[in-house]
A protein has these predicted regions:
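Short, charge-rich amphipathic alpha-helical segments embedded
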Residues: 25-37, 45, 51, 55-72
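Amphipathic, heptad-repeat alpha-helical segments
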Residues: 1-32
Length: 72
């Protein structure tokens, strides 16, 4: 559960970091997907489904980390 919370915290920090940026349509869709994963992870945590929560939080974190990386 702690790892899941760390991933969600990291994802939130990544989203705050990219918030001021102008995002293209694809990036905006990715942000929506990230937020959906985060919401689903929180529901899974509340239902005690630790594995599902971790998997969703991990996906959200990976996507948010990709958005934070500078484009080349």
């Amino acid at each position: 559960m702690q790892n899941t919370n760390q991933l969600l915290t990291s994802t939130d920090a990544n989203l705050k970091q990219i918030a001021p940026r102008q995002l293209n349509s694809s990036q905006q869709d990715t942000v929506k997907q990230i937020k959906s994963y985060v919401d689903q992870a929180k529901v899974a945590v509340s239902k005690g489904d630790v594995e599902r929560a971790y998997n969703l939080a991990s996906k959200a974190n990976m996507l948010s980390a990709d958005l934070v990386r500078p484009s080349r």
